[in-house]
Regions:
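Conserved glycine-rich cofactor-binding loop
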Residues: 12-14
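Conserved glycine-rich Rossmann-like NAD(P)H-binding loop of the short-chain dehydrogenase/reductase
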Residues: 26-43
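Catalytic Tyr-X3-Lys loop
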Residues: 92, 99-118, 136, 153, ...
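Substrate-binding pocket helix/loop in short-chain dehydrogenase/reductase
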Residues: 97-98, 102-107, 191, 198-202
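Active-site helix of classical SDR
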Residues: 121, 156, 164
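Alpha-helical segment proximal to the catalytic Tyr-Lys
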Residues: 126, 168-173
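Short C-terminal tail/terminal secondary-structure segment
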Residues: 145, 222, 226, 232-246
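Short, small/polar-rich loop/turn modules that mediate ligand/substrate recognition or access, typified
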Residues: 172-176, 232-233
Length: 246
């Protein structure tokens, strides 16, 4: 089987799903990880398999649980007998002011955003070394300039940025490790939805004066995995220039 294989966490919807589609279009086979969005994950898998048979599979796992992380890595590496890329996209995001944050908040946010990427990569190391593969970590522009009332989230993403650079040094020359930091691409949903006034305030500080598209992120990930063999240890901000005004 000559098609490269990518494991994408949190790939049932939003940026993860767009990344799976983009890599698939470029000839990759994809392992679609999901936690609770089984219907969306299976719909995506079936759509990709219709365009290219046996090229996508979905796997469930709670990335805050160590056993699930180990199982997901094993399944991803064994399904096609190889693994060429790990995309750490899954993330937990919600406010937790310091005076109100609980140990459960710490476990959930740090577990999903920092601990899981570390140990998932650890389990995938043999396969990635064999394939001379790549790792992409989805970070955030708030890893450098924190968002108010989100100390745990910002700390987790700052930690992931540090891991990105550390791994790039430690795992070279066998494995390249880079990061992508999205700006205003898709507004948060549900309880974390951003009101229109706040959206406009963010866009007013964005030189491109608009939101980005999910394909902007997926394209950046594809570039770093497919077209940048001499790039490692870099974190690419895809934010319309927003980080210039933070």
């Amino acid at each position: 089987m000559d098609n490269p294989v990518a494991l994408i966490t949190g790939a049932a919807h939003r940026l993860g799903a767009h990344t799976a589609k983009t890599l698939h279009q470029r000839g990759w086979n994809v392992v679609i990880h999901y936690r609770s969005r089984e219907t969306e994950a299976r719909d995506l898998m079936e759509s990709l398999n219709q365009s290219r048979p046996a090229s996508a599979v979905c796997k469930q796992g709670d990335l805050t649980q160590s056993r699930d992380v180990a199982r997901l890595a094993e399944q991803a590496c064994q399904h096609w007998g190889r693994l060429d890329a790990l995309v750490n996209n899954a993330s937990v995001f919600y406010p937790n002011p310091t005076s109100e944050a609980t140990e459960d908040d710490w476990q959930q946010i740090m577990g999903a955003n920092l601990k899981a990427p570390f140990f998932l990569l650890q389990h995938c190391l043999p396969a990635l070394r064999e394939s001379k593969g790549g790792v992409i970590n989805l970070i955030d522009i708030y890893s450098e300039k924190p968002l108010a009332d989100h100390p745990l989230y910002c700390a987790s993403k700052a930690g992931l940025a540090a891991l990105t650079r550390s791994w790039a040094k430690d795992l070279a020359p066998d494995i390249r490790v880079n990061g992508v930091s999205p700006g205003a691409i898709l507004w948060p949903e549900g309880d974390q939805a951003v009101d229109p006034e706040h959206q406009q305030a963010i866009l007013a500080k964005t030189p491109m004066a608009r939101t980005g598209q999910p394909d902007d992120i997926a394209g950046a990930i594809a570039y770093l995995l497919c077209d940048a063999p001499f790039v490692t240890g870099q974190i690419l901000s895809v934010d319309g220039g927003r980080s210039l005004n933070m």
